[in-house]
Every structure is written in C-alpha cells, then in structure tokens.
Swiss-Prot record:
GO BP terms, alphabetized: ribosomal large subunit biogenesis; translation
Signal peptide feature range: none
Record-level Gene Ontology MF annotations: RNA binding; structural constituent of ribosome
GO cellular component: cytosolic large ribosomal subunit
Name listed for the protein in its UniProt record: Large ribosomal subunit protein eL14
Length: 103
C-alpha cells in the first residue's frame, strides 16, 4: 500500500461519519493535517481539514494543483476515468482492523 500522502492522492476516510468514502487531497496543512474534498456531489465528502491518521492513501492519483476548487477536482477525476471508482464505498482498514472496531 502506498504511504505517501501528496496533493492529488486519492484517499479513503477510515474514521468518522464519512468512513469508507473516497476523497482527493487538495492541500497539505502540516505534517499532521491535510485538506480533502470528495467533491461532495461525487462522493459525499465535503471539503475539510482531516488528520492524516484518519485517512488511508490509495495507489490512485489525479492531476490537480494545490488548493484546487471542487469543480477542478471533479473535472480531473472525470478526465482520469476515476468517477465510478470514487463513488464506490469501501470497508476501511487501518492497521489491520476495520474502522468499526476502533471505538
């Protein structure tokens, strides 16, 4: 599994109400936080700052610039042919356990 979290990386949220949904990293705040977006109309994940421990990177990446708008991210996802992939929900796994076991 890819461990690099960079701008444009597709990630899966592993904790919270959006657990199992995919999003795209659009900005890196610091070593602990990144800004992600679904965008909401595609995956249901709204733009927000998240702790890097609450996301799991995938091997997919889209070409977006840092701070890209939701519309730019949506166009990049569709151009990369990942729209259906982004809509799929997954059972998140974090360190070998599922998010439902983390309570």
């Amino acid at each position: 599994m890819v461990k690099v979290i960079d701008v444009g990386r597709v990630v899966v949220k592993v904790l919270g109400r959006e657990a199992g949904r995919k999003a795209v990293v659009v900005d890196i705040v610091d070593e602990n936080y990144v800004v992600i977006t679904g965008p909401k109309q595609l995956t249901g994940v709204r733009r927000r700052r998240v702790n890097v421990n609450h996301i799991e990177p995938t091997d997919k990446k889209v070409e977006v610039k840092r701070g890209a708008s939701d519309e730019e991210v949506l166009k990049a996802v569709e151009a990369a042919g990942l729209a259906d992939y982004m809509r799929e929900r997954v059972k998140p796994q974090m360190f070998g356990i599922t998010a439902s076991e983390v309570r």
